[in-house]
Amino acid sequence: MGYLIDGYKPTDDQFKNLSHIGISFLRADNIKGDVVMTDGWDNIDEVVSSAHKNDVKAIISFGGGSYIVTSELMGVKKNRQNLIKNIVRFMAKHNLDGFDCDWEPSWLDDKKEMESVNNAISHHYIKFIKELRIAIDAEFGKGEKSFSAAVMNANNIWYSDQKQISHFPQNGWWHFLDWVALMNYDNDLGAKHSTFESVYGPNGSVKYWNSFGVPLEKIVTGIPFYARAGWGEEWLFYKDIVKMNTNLSFETDFIMYKKNGLNEKEYGFNGKSTIVKKVQENKKLNLPGIMFWQLAGDVEVNSEHSLLRAINKNLN
């Protein structure tokens, strides 16, 4: 599954290498549960129609990393149920094939405030997941629409002073989902960003979430189509790295680069060889699939450097 933002419409060649697209993001516009899309999605129906013409499922993704979900929204039954009603209506209106819950921890400089905001996940996550599953099945028929969620590489905000902020509760919310996608990126910086070991190693994300309770048959791993050197603007699309390095080796997973006058740093990404290795490990573990953020970061799919092409070729 490839995530799309800002109205990005995949090419037909890209669609041929996809099973699902995640249209990002739908958000609550207020604590009453009214919903609105992020900027750029005036063409949502066109993108959904193109996906369906190519036998690709179009899923709506809710939330996102920069979006703050509050207890006033999720902890108040009337507001939560109004949100659920509006999500179901939105799915029906735009002929969507599923819902992806990308309710993430919120990054706030004030750690006490961050802990308070993110307590909404611990206290209300399963209420939202369970009630939305019931509503989706009631409206469209049991199993007619997919329901998934995206979670952190591990169950904490690793770079905060308090490493156990914003737990996803260990109360079985995954039983209501078809799959759980691990956001296996932004876990570290430079050459340590999204390494094979951080996902599949003995202390990696797959092992962590499986031990947490999520069965392997529901775990979808995540791959970045970008490089990360620091927080904020210190990132690069994979396609820009290829453009700047015409002789880029398939084995290369980081480059040294100075962006916008900042200090030269390691920009860590997943090169083609690492992508292939990850896909092969996924198949070895019988995991159901791979997702990536985001499709616009890849080169043209007919390029030998295309990550989408490498994933599809080795997954199928």
Residue ranges and their predicted role:
Residues 1-91, 117, 191-201, 217, ...:
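Glycan-recognition patch characteristic of GH18 chitinases/ENGases
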Residues 3-17, 75-92, 157-173, 269-283:
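Short, acidic/polar
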Residues 15-18, 44-48, 80-84, 88, ...:
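Extracytoplasmic/secreted envelope proteins and their assembly/folding machinery
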Residues 17-18, 216-283, 301, 306-316:
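Glycan-binding loop/region signatures in secreted carbohydrate-active enzymes
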Residues 17-19, 54-58, 95-99, 143-145, ...:
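Short, well-ordered coil/turn segments that N-cap beta-strands
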Residues 21, 60, 101, 132, ...:
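Conserved, mostly hydrophobic/aromatic
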Residues 31-42, 85, 105-247:
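Substrate-binding surface in catalytic domains of secreted glycosidases
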Residues 63-71, 103-107, 154:
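Aromatic-lined carbohydrate-binding surfaces of glycoside hydrolases
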